[in-house]
Amino acid sequence: MNKFVKSLLVAGSVAALAACSSSNNDAAGNGAAQTFGGYSVADLQQRYNTVYFGFDKYDITGEYVQILDAHAAYLNATPAAKVLVEGNTDERGTPEYNIALGQRRADAVKGYLAGKGVDAGKLGTVSYGEEKPAVLGHDEAAYSKNRRAVLAY
């Protein structure tokens, strides 16, 4: 009888462990969160989705290359993914000038991504000029946060 109880306990333990095991099937299909250039999809879409620009500038500086490369890798690896690049400016300048500058910023990011092989059909652009400030204020601290392009998925 003692041997029977031990066998029953071992079988019960094995069954309990089997019930606690989990499948390796996640969104990436490999048991780990999928990353692109070291960034998770959530990080790319929510935390690292903004490129900032200097005053009256629309060139992409080196500090954004790694992030944009990660966005390009994500877009290239994800057939259904599309992004709208939103160009923005600070409040200085005429509304017409700022719309044009915001568009140049959006186009610069789009051009960078296209240069990394992203299909142009996955890339849209829009300029909001000064109409959608990230930070309200009339000083350089606010202006620097408003001169941006946002990748909106």
UniProtKB/Swiss-Prot annotation:
Function description: Part of the Tol-Pal system, which plays a role in outer membrane invagination during cell division and is important for maintaining outer membrane integrity.
PANTHER family given in the database record: LIPOPROTEIN YIAD-RELATED, STATOR ELEMENT OF FLAGELLAR MOTOR COMPLEX
Signal peptide coordinates: 1-19
GO CC aspect terms: cell outer membrane
Primary location recorded for the protein, binned into one broad class: membrane
Residue intervals of the OmpA-like domain: 40-153
Family matches, as Gene3D superfamilies: OmpA-like domain
Lipid-attached positions, N-palmitoyl cysteine: C20
Ranges for region Peptidoglycan binding: 55-56, 97-101
NCBIfam families assigned: Pal_lipo
High-level lineage: Bacteria, Pseudomonadati, Pseudomonadota, Gammaproteobacteria, Pasteurellales
Compartment annotation: Cell outer membrane
Topology versus the membrane: Lipid-anchor
Protein name: Peptidoglycan-associated lipoprotein
Quaternary context: The Tol-Pal system is composed of five core proteins: the inner membrane proteins TolA, TolQ and TolR, the periplasmic protein TolB and the outer membrane protein Pal. They form a network linking the inner and outer membranes and the peptidoglycan layer.
Lipid addition sites, S-diacylglycerol cysteine: C20
Similarity annotation: Belongs to the Pal lipoprotein family.
Gene Ontology BP term (one): cell division
Pfam families the record matches: OmpA (PF00691)
Keywords, ordered alphabetically: Cell cycle, Cell division, Cell outer membrane, Lipoprotein, Membrane, Palmitate, Signal
